Swiss-Prot record:
It comes from Lacticaseibacillus casei (Lactobacillus casei). Part of the FGAM synthase complex composed of 1 PurL, 1 PurQ and 2 PurS subunits. PANTHER family: PHOSPHORIBOSYLFORMYLGLYCINAMIDINE SYNTHASE SUBUNIT PURQ. The gene is purQ. This is Phosphoribosylformylglycinamidine synthase subunit PurQ. It catalyses: N(2)-formyl-N(1)-(5-phospho-beta-D-ribosyl)glycinamide + L-glutamine + ATP + H2O = 2-formamido-N(1)-(5-O-phospho-beta-D-ribosyl)acetamidine + L-glutamate + ADP + phosphate + H(+); L-glutamine + H2O = L-glutamate + NH4(+). The lineage of its organism: Bacteria, Bacillati, Bacillota, Bacilli, Lactobacillales.
Amino acid sequence: MHDIAGVTNETGNVLGMMPHPERAVEALLGGTDGLGVFQSLINQTEGADVRGAR
């Protein structure tokens, strides 16, 4: 319906998605288009205080 591939909550800190970016992170396997998803996760969590996080 409407070609929706993913959804987030209002604050953007919860993501649900149908594509599999982990399958597109190695050029040897056909492409690196999925790297952006994982790089953004790294960028957002670097320096974050995760003590006590569960």
